[in-house]
């Protein structure tokens, strides 16, 4: 009879029951000669990831494996053990799909070295399989419970939440002290990875006491597993799902971002297509992961924060604000805006062949007049408007906890000299002034810029995480909604730009009428650009802005990726998606943007929202130390940082293309930085005579 491993350990005290029913305090057990103990770890459940209202984005469930429970045999030679185990495998195959494959040596060595631990023979059981087997497994088979990660909303916010996976396969061979009883989980992507330490709990401990003949004397849980902390995001799950639904109906590939201007909180960051996070539980096969990578729609790639695209005409408000702030133009300055202008040997066109005539800045924004912006961009100069763009967050990652976030690109003379072998020329300036050329930004950056213009004087510091809480609900870290980067621009200049953006949607001849709302004035800017290799003839469309006009509260950006040879425009494709989103939320938006009422002191009962938190595990089988039910519960979120009152200003109280900058698709065997880097698309074609990028006339409405 094989004996247990010869490991020495102090015999624990405390209430426990021996295999034959004796107490742990029974002196006979303590006095057994050559008795040995083995300590095992009980992996703790990960803490939940929640939306701002306490809705779970990631939590845990109890899943079950089918396992062989060897027990102690009177006669235990190799042939007998292998034959007995084979019969258990045959029985298991009758009830579940995908029973694991074992060699005779595997079956024998598990009995020889670790028969006191179950041998898992299946993946997670399906609900139907579990119900069929519950209480009917037969001799030698057991249902073995483990904690499994669960993503209740499937693909919702998949690029932000990320996914988790097993740290490694369970060990084989002789048992070592402090081995995990089942596979431990670690974050592999997104918040799951970036907040892995906060989400991980503290393992529990179990000790097994054996006699010299290998029979189990005592099984004792000495420490219960302690669940991980709670990560509360700024996302609004209802809004996130609505945005994803709008994208699903409106495009095959695109992105939708919404930011609370008052706090900088990211409420929505949707990318289409996404992927079901539950496909990664408990793990994903190499074949399935490769299929996701090879999918031409690139579901693992977040267009919202990893994609770098020319912002096109959605960038024009930045140029207008820079020119107004510098005094290059005033609200009343009229500039003749023909159908095209000539710079050197090149002609730069408007999107329409009809001259706009002498127009002011508000009309230029409303009509998205390229020739007005060519001229004004050159007058104010690239240093001024590109400098303001950087202040508004273009050209740098936002700093949010996002893996593979693009920095975009705002060129400098140094960058141009290094990469294009020239300084920024007038032709480059003309292209940049309409958001094209080498200028690149993500939808998240465009929405952030709109938040700054909507605010008028400052750029809110973006937030994606509201709080990280410990198991007891104590706040480990919390966002600071008061943090802002001051722009140093004339508030009146920003007001003029906002008026022009209002006319885009609500004025005569505006290019964004498709986004007009029934209950408030929305300010926006359309944008359309060529994108990708010229051979694909592919365009993308933008609609970005904020609402309401008189006291902006929400900034947004929507990106529509067109198919090759498809005619698209921001006014026709992206603007209607914005309308659909905000009209659906009409009552909620109206309430949140309503002017604050006179304060009235009242005494009322606490009706604070509930935030789902991980609580200490109570439902543990005392015999095994394994979970019997999810260790989750609810508790009032009395310590959440409140948002500012509705309506209250917190400060008062060429050929154009996009490079997939820093594109990251996370894979199970990714390198240390967790990223896979793809080759960029073909370089931009340049004019052989002057090497100046040209802006192609792209229709706006």
Where does each model-flagged region fall?
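Membrane-proximal periplasmic segments of bacterial cell-envelope enzymes
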Residues: 1-216, 223-224, 249-255, 261, ...
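Compositionally biased, proline/threonine/alanine/serine-rich low-complexity intrinsically disordered stretches
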Residues: 3-24, 591-592, 596-701
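N-terminal leader/targeting segments and the immediately adjacent pre-domain N-terminus
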Residues: 16, 227-247, 270-272, 690-693, ...
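Short coil/loop residues immediately preceding or within conserved phosphate-binding loops
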Residues: 44, 230, 251-253, 300, ...
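Solvent-exposed, polar/charged alpha-helical surfaces in well-ordered, non-transmembrane soluble domains
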Residues: 55, 64, 83, 87-90, ...
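Beta-lactam-recognizing serine transpeptidase/beta-lactamase-like catalytic domain environment
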Residues: 58, 210-222, 261-314, 318-566, ...
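Conserved serine DD-peptidase/penicillin-binding transpeptidase domain
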Residues: 137, 172-195, 199, 223, ...
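C-terminal, active-site-flanking charged/polar segments
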Residues: 550, 572-595
